[in-house]
Structure formats: structure tokens, C-alpha cells
Amino acid sequence: MKIKFRALLATVLMGGLLVSGCGANQPEPVVPEGSQEIVISNAEKVETDYDCIVVDGSPEGISAAISAARNGLKTLLICQDAALGGLYTLGELNFIDVPESRSGQLLVGGIYKEFSDAVGGSGFDIIKAKNTFYQMVANEDNLTLRVNSRFKKPLMDGQTITGIEVEEDGKNVKYHAPVVIDATPDGNVCAAADVPYTFAGEDIGERDREMGVTLVFRLSGVDWDKVTAHVTKIPEGETAAEGDVNGNLAWGYSKEGFAYEPTDEAMRLRGFNIARQDNGDVLLNALIIFDVDALDPASCAEGIARGEAELPMIIDYMRAHCEGFEKATLVNTAEQLYVRETRHMECEKMLTIDDVLENRAQEDAICVTNYPVDVQATKTQRFGTVVGFPDQYEISFGSLVPKKVDGLMIVGRSAGFTSLAAGSARIVPTGMACGQAAGVAAKLCVDKDMTPRELYGNEKGIKKMQKPLEKQGALLAHQETEEPVMSHWAYEGLKVIRSMGYADGGYDNNYRLDDEVTGPRFCNLVNLAIKKSGLSLEERVTVSKEPDNAEMLLALSAKVAGLEGVAAPTDFEGATAFFEERKVLDQTLSKKFADGQATADAGSCYMLAARLYEHLLTQPNAIKYVAINDLSK
């Protein structure tokens, strides 16, 4: 049974001072017992003018609002849902991706850690998380919460945002503030304010590269002891178990997941991330759904319906093939989909894939974090890929400052991250750290009568922001780490290809640069370079499975000659001269490909493809994508 709980958000008259919120001046919230959930309702009267407005009740938005309130700003938190927590609660994604360095050091503290400690870390109980988020908000005197409040449009004065218009109880209401923080997962406020953005992999020419979304589902009747025994069992002939267990978390069943054949072709089951709840139920993050337009509510609803239609077959399959799930029964699905990527807003500083994988520091750092660059499966690519795994990197305050519009900041997965960098930076703990920084920045902006953009360009202001951040628990100590691959002679070529989205270093950052190249790998590299230049790829470069240098250079020179409208070389010496003339082969690369009967290593082919790309950019109608590096820098 749910307890009806008044939100305690009324404006209180106290000694002539109006205090909005539900903190120390109000009765303490009653903590419900067991699985009982606090039900939030809005106060009947609320002010319309604030110092800071935060849009969305996501974890990132909650962190931003609490931070702004703690720093003395009269803050309004707008939540379109009836409960707080977004992806963590309504999406039921309770498998926290905890940013830790390779030495095991926690990288994100502050408000994120307060929440994590309160709910017991990763694998938290969903109802406990909802109540914890509410109580964290309720404790802040300066913070007013509005639930079931749907953002409609920004209020603009030229290129400056001055507030927002929302819909509450069927009525349009306007709220005003000098600083607005967009914490919506998709950057809805920024987009409505006409901040430029790219979609999915558009910044590298892959706008249609939409990672699948996930529908988390809850099962009862799962034998936890069998599950943990299964995922930790070392199969015969193997040296390690497929999965593992950590408290209420278990992961594994990859073979079983990928072996499932869905009735819906635009769907896939992968390995299971399993989280046990306080009542013994388990939550599963395993079902990938494609062909969902995550910016369209109707498409998202259809995606959930498709997932729910597939689940009876999935559960039958699990009962028959997955140890520990023999008596599993579906309880429910999450209210919202787990969406990994939509918009990437253009900000003053865009976090790049090299920032991430070279563990770079930032002068205006507002958090330190890490996570594998995890690009999940797409409809055309059955398996996802891990581009690399950083030790730790910093995020710039400029990544929270959208271009074109003043008075606005953005936190969450749609902030100023290029599409590949977002594969790492999109996780919620990182977003909560950015949210906390945005709250501190809002305080400085209000006190100094400056915009976030002006603060970004103010060195003294940045230092004034970093000091209170650290005092309030943020972790800004960064350890510079140079990855071994960065000293490889072919690393500059790898960087170019990696920034195109074609490099799989895995969790150990091993790009196999010294391996002898295979025919398919060579073709993938050079065809990618041609494709990314925007030139014709009607006929792909093809070679045998085990080509020698002569075969590779002749096949490639024939394609490039065709693109340029010139005669193709007819022998190995001619192909070598062809590429030397175009500076695709420099002195070092010429030596690597000098023996026509030998086969170059992968590093040489990465350099060849990168230099080919640079050459092709000189051709008419070539395209230079903004997120792709080049060798001339």
C-alpha cells in the first residue's frame, strides 16, 4: 500500500522572510516502511520568480537543484513525472556504473556519493531510490519541487533565456530565473531555445547510427543461488568464468542471451545484467530494441509495447535454457526506456574521444570521471564495441555551456560531448557530478551578474567555482596517465581512424597495431577512410583474405585513381609512386610497404588509411566531419 504524502512544498512565512521548500522549517518527512512509496503532490501556491530553474527530475537534475539550493539560490526543480529519479527509478536502471580509477579510487563524490551511500550503492532497491531522492530534495529549504510539470517552451529575450513555460494541471504556467539548467536527457530546453546540436553519430557522418534502447523488466521466482553459481562457474576448457557477482548484482548468460531468436527482427537479447531487489525480485537489463525514435513519445510507447509483446517468449526461453530462471515470472516492465543517445548539444568545449582515451586534464575542470567508451549494438551491428577504457579524465565547465544561448547550462548525456566521447561520459554519476558543478556555477553567475558563458571565459571565476565544489565533496584530483599505445609509432594514424568510430581497443586498450593485417581489416580501414571523406564508395576496395603489400596498394590505387579520374597504376612500383606523389606514403610508410611480397602490420595500415583520408579531403566535394581528427594538427 502506498502512503499519501503531501509534498511539503508550500511557501512558508517565517519572520517576514519567504522560504520555499520542504527542509528544516517543515516537519520531517515520514519514512515509509518496507516497500511503501512516498507519493508526491504539489503545493497549491507557488512563486513564479527564482534565482535558478532546473528542468527535469533526473538524477542529474536533482543534483543540480540541490547544489544550487545549498549554495543559497532560491531554486525551482521541474519534474515532468510523478516521481523523482528518471532513468534510475522510472527506467529501473539500478546497475550503477561507478567511475573508479585503475587503482580502485572513487572518482565521483559529492551529491552522487550521498545518494549512493544512502541506497547502498549499485543494485539499489527502486522504491528506496525514489524515496531517497525525494528526501534529499525535501531537506533543502531553498528548493521548490513541482511534479507532473511538463516543459513546453523557453522564455527568451533575444538570445538569452529568462525562464520557462510549463503545463501543470492543464494550465500553462510561466517561471522566471536568470539561470536555467537543462537536465532533460535529450536536451529539450536547449533544442527548443535553438542551441545547435548533432544527433547520434551525425558528427562523424553517422546520423542513422542509433544505439538500441533497453526495456528493463522485473522477474519473481528467480533462484538467486543458482544464478550466482552459474555466472561464477568456470566452463570446461576456460580459465575464467563468463560473469561475476557483487552483492545484489550478477552478470553473465551472454551465450544464452545471444542465442535467443526474437520474433521481432528489430530486437535482440544480450548478456544479462541482473540486480536483486529487497523483496527478492530481480531486474534485468538485457533486452535491446531497435527502430525506436527516442525523441518521439509515441515511438517510445510503441517500443515498450513491442518489448512487452516479446517478453512472454523470452521468459519461456529463459525457463528452458537459463539456469536459475526455471520458475521465473514476469512482474512488470519499467515505465520508461533506457535510451543511451539522442542529441549532442554544441557547447563551448566539446569533450572529444582523445580527451577521454588520453586521460586529459582540463584547466576549467568541474569533475573527474571514467567509463569504457561503450558503443552499444545497432540494428546493423549485432554486437556493440568498446573503443577503449580510460583511467581517468576531466570534464571542462565549457561542456556545460551551450553555444548561442545565454543564461543556460546543460547537464546529462546530451551535454557538450562528441558522440564517441559520450559513450563514456553519458553515465549518470558523471552527469550528477556535472549537475553539482552547474549548481555552484549558477550561484556565481547570480552573485556576479554574469552569464555561464562569461564565467567560462573568466579564469578567476573558474577557480572560485572549483574551490566550493571541492569543499562540498566534489573530487577534482586528477592523475595523469599516459596509455602505452600513445607511444606507438602509428598512434597518430590510429587517432584519426579512432575518431571516425572505427577502432576497437577493448577494455585493455589493445588495438593490435603490431599484428599482421588481414584482408578484411585492410579493406575496412581504407573503405572507411574513403566513406568518411564523402566521396563515392559504390565499389568497395577488395583484396584476398591474406594479401601482400602489392595486392593491397594496387587495389587501393585503382580505387583512388578512379575517384580522381586518372589512369590507375598497373604494377606495384607504379602504385607505390602513385601514393608517394600524393604524400599518402611518406618515407616511413614507404619502408613499411617496400616489400611487395610481404604483408604490412595493422599499424602501418592505420597510418595509410589516415593519410589517405587527409589526401582525399583535398578533392572537390570532400567532407570534413567536425569530430574527426587530422594529421596536420
Give the predicted meaning of each segment:
Residues 87, 172-173, 177-179, 187-463, ...:
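Flavin (FAD/FMN)-binding glycine-rich loop and adjacent Rossmann-like elements that form
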Residues 155-174:
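Conserved beta-strand-loop-beta-strand element in the redox core of flavoprotein oxidoreductases
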Residues 18-21:
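C-terminal motif of bacterial Sec signal peptides marking the signal peptidase cleavage site
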Residues 39-43, 47-49, 67, 73-74, ...:
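Conserved N-terminal/central alpha/beta ligand/cofactor-binding core
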Residues 23-40:
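Short, low-complexity, disordered segments immediately C-terminal to signal peptides
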Residues 1-9:
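Bacterial N-terminal signal peptides that target proteins for export
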Residues 55-59:
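Glycine-rich Rossmann-fold phosphate-binding loop(s) that bind the pyrophosphate
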Residues 25, 499-633:
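Terminal recognition/anchoring or ligand-binding modules at protein termini
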